[in-house]
């Protein structure tokens, strides 16, 4: 599926869309779009080998879990195309990045903009915290750390079947604090699962504040290497650096791209709130109006109209 937009245009569109949504709803996962927009844009617009979407452009309501009376159940992976052997698969590990992920699907033409109007509504599959039935999601990742494990298992199975398609995992740095992440890396390295790729959004902040004050993780690249992975460290806002990192030779090892980012990239007024940026809710109508005006100017759009 070819997109006429440049990756930089897609990334800007992601930030604009998440910003507009957050202003209208008096809050949202803004910082995740700031830090991850370039990575998600690059994955969907350039790196991933995906087929045409197999699900409706406007997502259907959640019909319930698989059962005898719900045989048409499907995951949200259909927005990434069919699971053909030659196609890549994407696991979005941090489920709270869902808003940024939906905005990405819209910007690359895999979901209609109207789908975002269903965000976080009762009965909607467009969940605030993405689940396996949410657009672009293939598995449930409510437990941080499980995404890389799932990706490793999927990649191992694909290799056993001789499928040429790769498995990509998009991760957040908070998951580095989870022991399951390191078990997955060690297992993938031991079994030589080199069709497993991951990019880690290292934005230095999490729900309880700055990573360094919650539980510092030290040299992430060095740790991945000690556990047997091939790791490359880059500026996570540099698209060319991502392109080159993905070309790194890594026979017999998973490839991990450690992408250092800013949680207020493109929305610098948010810097005053750091590190309390995990979920941005405006403290007053005055702050909301000020943020709307200042960030809109930085993103090159008009201030967002909203109902107080």
What residues fall within each predicted segment?
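N-terminal hydrophobic or amphipathic helices/low-complexity stretches enriched
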Residues: 1-14
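Charged, low-complexity surface patches
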Residues: 11, 29, 94, 177, ...
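A structural signal for short, well-ordered beta-strand segments and their strand-loop junctions
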Residues: 31, 91, 256-258
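N-terminal capping segment at the start of a domain
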Residues: 11-27, 201-203
């Amino acid at each position: 599926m070819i997109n006429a937009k440049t990756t930089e245009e897609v990334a800007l569109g992601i930030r604009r869309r998440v910003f507009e949504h957050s202003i209208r709803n008096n809050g949202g996962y803004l910082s995740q779009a700031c830090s991850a927009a370039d990575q998600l844009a690059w994955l969907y617009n350039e790196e991933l080998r995906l087929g045409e979407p197999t699900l409706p452009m406007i997502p259907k309501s959640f019909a319930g879990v698989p059962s005898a009376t719900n045989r048409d159940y499907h995951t949200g992976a259909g927005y990434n195309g069919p699971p053909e052997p030659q196609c890549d698969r994407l696991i979005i590990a941090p489920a709270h990045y869902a808003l940024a992920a939906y905005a990405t699907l819209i910007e690359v033409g895999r979901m209609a903009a109207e789908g975002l109007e269903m965000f976080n509504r009762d009965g909607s599959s467009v969940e605030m915290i993405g689940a396996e039935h949410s657009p672009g999601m293939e598995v449930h990742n409510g437990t941080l750390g499980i995404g890389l494990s799932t990706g490793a298992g999927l990649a191992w199975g694909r290799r056993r079947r001789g499928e040429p398609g790769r498995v990509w995992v998009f991760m957040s740095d908070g998951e580095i604090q989870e022991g399951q992440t390191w078990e997955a890396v060690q297992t993938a390295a031991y079994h030589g699962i080199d069709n497993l790729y991951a990019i880690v959004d290292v934005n230095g902040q999490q729900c309880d504040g700055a990573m360094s004050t919650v539980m510092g993780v030290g040299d992430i690249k060095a740790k991945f290497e000690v556990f047997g992975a091939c790791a490359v460290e880059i500026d996570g806002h540099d698209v060319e650096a991502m392109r080159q990192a993905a070309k790194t030779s890594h026979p017999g090892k998973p490839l991990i791209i450690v992408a250092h980012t800013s949680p207020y990239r493109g929305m610098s007024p948010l810097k005053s709130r750091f590190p309390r940026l995990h979920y941005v809710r405006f403290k007053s109508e005055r702050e909301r109006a000020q943020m709307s005006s200042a960030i809109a100017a930085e993103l090159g759009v008009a201030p967002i109209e909203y109902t107080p």
